[in-house]
């Protein structure tokens, strides 16, 4: 029996790619799809929402509750406000939730995860999550003898800075080094000397860059760089679908807060 997956934010850049991945994946079927109120896709078949050539028999809706009620697991890539509505619906219907929504620092996910299975990751790319494991291991080997700098670049419409992915790298390194996570951004008008033990961040924004990340370990003799470049957003969509399948098959009866690190 196929896993019924709902999609919140189906008319967005990520939502469309997730629907495409669901359409081509033989393990799942689309249970429902939500677009924002006022979207031109409301009431239309989801086939047209993802530029698919044929109708799929499911209409795009604005009702988050309806989609959670009819789904085995739901994928959300939206905003903080919409994610809060998703969490409430997930609690009501006991539906596992996968989310890649960022800028949610004020939401206490652990509170909700005590009642329902939630998988949240700032980046659903398998490659980025493999890199995260490598970064942790590098930090353990190198200890506090190296300065750490994290650079990220994204498209010119991205709102959060540094990116959620860059922050996850920083937290993982701080944890491996057993130090407090103190993100540090050096500005051109600052006269402060680089403080030892702080994790530096540099941010670039431009064009349509999907996502570049570089983690550097530097001392006076050498520099080690670990890099990842996302070529297409499909990598995030594919990872999100993989996460949804994993969450439903392995944790649907086990409340908790999971991440892509558990999946790969």
From Swiss-Prot:
Pathway participation: Amino-acid biosynthesis; L-lysine biosynthesis via DAP pathway; (S)-tetrahydrodipicolinate from L-aspartate: step 4/4
EC identifiers of the protein: 1.17.1.8
PROSITE patterns (alphabetical): DAPB
Keyword hit for Cytoplasm: yes
Signal peptide: none
Catalytic machinery residues: 154 (proton donor/acceptor), 158 (proton donor)
Reaction equation(s) it catalyzes: (S)-2,3,4,5-tetrahydrodipicolinate + NAD(+) + H2O = (2S,4S)-4-hydroxy-2,3,4,5-tetrahydrodipicolinate + NADH + H(+); (S)-2,3,4,5-tetrahydrodipicolinate + NADP(+) + H2O = (2S,4S)-4-hydroxy-2,3,4,5-tetrahydrodipicolinate + NADPH + H(+)
SUPFAM superfamilies: Glyceraldehyde-3-phosphate dehydrogenase-like, C-terminal domain, NAD(P)-binding Rossmann-fold domains
NCBIfam families linked to this entry: dapB (TIGR00036)
Entry protein name: 4-hydroxy-tetrahydrodipicolinate reductase
Organism, scientific name: Wolbachia sp. subsp. Brugia malayi (strain TRS)
Lineage: Bacteria, Pseudomonadati, Pseudomonadota, Alphaproteobacteria, Rickettsiales
Gene: dapB
